[in-house]
């Protein structure tokens, strides 16, 4: 009778650590994906804002350049309230939605050269950068798929990049202030 219980005891003693390590690995994977999500979201917003500043610079306005805002340094783009406090409060309260914003890049339309579409260029530059990042994500997916390098984790990371940037592009096209769509709509009509 003791022989029948030995395998059961061995399975039980190995089963608990195995379950623990699977849960532990899943927790680490969720943490990695969460950190990646935050980094991608933040830098997608930074690229979006830099695009506005660069479009203004291209049209003759040096305001963003002189303010040091044409940089990938994320600290220059952090809005304490919109980039830190609002997302933190939403996270702590287990909100189903998490959002925030960066400091808008300053520009002065009176400095624009004789380009009647300069305001539209500046407003649409951020959206175009987000759509470009979606395009790069799709290209990366197809390239990795072609070379047979894809796995579930890589697909998940690429999906995060694409989804964040699709959301940012379409959200910013809404014709309500302060979204870029409002500026575009205002200039056209």
What is each model feature region?
Residues 2-189:
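Hydrophobic transmembrane alpha-helices and their immediate loop junctions
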């Amino acid at each position: 009778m003791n022989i029948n219980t030995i395998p059961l005891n061995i399975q039980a003693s190995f089963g608990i650590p195995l379950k623990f390590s699977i849960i532990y690995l899943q927790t680490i994977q969720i943490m990695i994906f969460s950190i990646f999500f935050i980094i991608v979201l933040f830098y997608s917003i930074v690229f979006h804002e830099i695009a506005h500043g660069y479009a203004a610079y291209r049209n003759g306005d040096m305001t963003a350049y002189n303010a040091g805002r044409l940089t990938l340094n994320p600290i220059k783009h952090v809005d304490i309230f919109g980039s830190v406090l609002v997302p933190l409060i939403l996270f702590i309260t287990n909100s189903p939605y998490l959002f925030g914003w960066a400091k808008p890049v300053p520009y002065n339309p009176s400095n624009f050269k004789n380009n009647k579409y300069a305001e539209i260029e500046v407003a649409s530059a951020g959206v175009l950068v987000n759509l470009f990042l979606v395009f790069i994500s799709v290209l990366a997916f197809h390239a990795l798929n072609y070379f047979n390098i894809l796995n579930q984790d890589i697909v998940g990371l690429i999906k995060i990049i694409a989804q964040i940037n699709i959301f940012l592009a379409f959200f910013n096209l809404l014709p309500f202030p302060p979204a870029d769509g409002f500026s575009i709509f205002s200039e056209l009509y």
